[in-house]
Structure formats: C-alpha cells, structure tokens
Regions:
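C-terminal amphipathic alpha-helix
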Residues: 30-50, 94-141
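Short, solvent-exposed, charged loop/turn and helix-capping segments
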Residues: 57-64, 74-101, 118-122
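Intrinsically disordered, low-complexity regions
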Residues: 11-12, 20, 80, 118
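C-terminal motif of bacterial Sec signal peptides marking the signal peptidase cleavage site
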Residues: 5-8
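A structural signal for well-ordered alpha-helices, especially hydrophobic packing surfaces
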Residues: 48, 71-82, 108, 112
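Immediate post-signal-peptide N-terminus of mature secreted/exported proteins
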Residues: 13-69, 136-141
Length: 141
C-alpha cells in the first residue's frame, strides 16, 4: 500500500497498512481506512434496507436518524482515520481503495433510490414529523 503523509493540526499523519498513525503523538488507530470505508458502506446499506421496509413516515424518520446516529458513532470512534480518508482526492481514493469505493458508490445509489421510493411518505409528513425530520438533518449540518 502506498504511504501517504498528511498534515493537520494534530500533527503529521501517515497512512499505514494498519491504519492512520499520528506521527507527533502515541495515538494509533488499529483500523485500516478500507475497514472504515466498509463500515460506512454497511451503515448506508442498512439504512437503505430500513428505508425500503419503512411503512410509515415515522419509520422513515427513524431510519434516517439511525443512519445519522451510526455515522456519528463511526466519526467518534474512527474520526482520525475518516479525516485522513477525507483529505484524499476521488482519484486517490479509487486508486487506493477500488473495491471499497465501488461498494460506497453502490451504497449511495441504493440509499438514494430507497429514499426516492418513499417520496409519498415524505410528501405527507405532519408538521410534527417534518419538525422532527428537520432537527435530525440540521444536527448533521
């Protein structure tokens, strides 16, 4: 695997086969970037399945909240690795993680299709449901 050195306020980061290591501290993540990408893919695929199974607007909102909650959990646990991955260009990502990026693209499409398939539920939100949904979305912005 190619070695990539990244600069950030936390110090220089070096991508290794075992994860991203902060060169200025003893912090080290034992999780490889490819693993974090696949955890994100799993979260998106789970959310797409939950959306597809949603029969009510509340279930749709819950599925969205679950995805955002899982993404926050991943960020809290693997933020340093995610930050390093986020600094890569799309070309670098595709070069370093071709299978993972293909899975990510498919997961994003599946999630979008699942959400579009529930447009009827989104169009009929009550004011309370709309407010709840917007709070979930705004918390992520």
């Amino acid at each position: 695997m190619a070695v990539l050195v990244l600069a950030s306020c936390g110090g220089d980061k070096k991508e290794t086969a075992n994860g991203v290591e902060n060169q200025n501290t003893t912090e080290h993540s034992a999780v490889a970037p490819a693993d974090v990408i696949m955890m994100t893919v799993k979260a998106m695929n789970d959310a797409a399945a939950n959306l597809e199974n949603a029969a009510t607007a509340d279930e749709l909102i819950d599925a969205t909240a679950d995805l955002y909650s899982e993404m926050k959990r991943l960020q809290a646990n693997y933020g340093e690795v995610m930050l390093a991955v986020d600094t890569l260009s799309e070309e670098q990502m595709n070069e370093l993680y071709p299978e993972e990026m293909k899975a990510m693209e498919e997961a994003a499409i599946n999630y979008s299709v699942a959400m579009m398939g529930k447009a009827d539920l989104m169009e009929n939100l009550t004011p309370e449901q709309e407010e709840r949904f917007m709070k979930i979305i705004e918390a992520e912005l």
